[in-house]
Amino acid sequence: MIKYFDLQRISDSFEPEISDVIIRVLRSGWYLQGEENHLFEKAFADYCGTTCCVGVGNGLDALTLIFMAYCELGEMQPGDEVIVPANTYIASILGVIRAGMRPVFCEPSLL
């Protein structure tokens, strides 16, 4: 078999550092939140050139928080319509609904 993209070769260079972090997390017992999470959030915020970063468990949580933040900032409000592609993953819709908004389905155009 000819490998199209050798992920093993790429990940081998990161393996020692990643293994060390995994061991620290396992030994600490903090699988959610914890010091490693806070260190990552700080490093990622620095990398992005911003002051804050919030790690979430999945894309649905991320979308929900984004829409809730827009409401908090007054950019959107519950009941607003949010256009979503008709053929999408359910998290795209649930994030809108969780924030109290209404998804409006549309077919993308390739004009």
Show where each model-derived region lies.
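N-terminal "arm"/small-domain region of PLP-dependent enzymes with the aminotransferase-like
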Residues: 1-30, 35
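Conserved coil-to-alpha-helix start sites within the AMP-binding
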Residues: 87-93
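Short, glycine/acidic-enriched loop or turn micro-motifs at the edges of active sites
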Residues: 9, 89, 110
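Short hydrophobic motif
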Residues: 6, 22, 44-45, 82
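Short beta->alpha connector loops at strand-helix junctions that form conserved
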Residues: 86, 105-109
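Phosphate-binding glycine-rich loop
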Residues: 30, 35-81, 95-99, 105
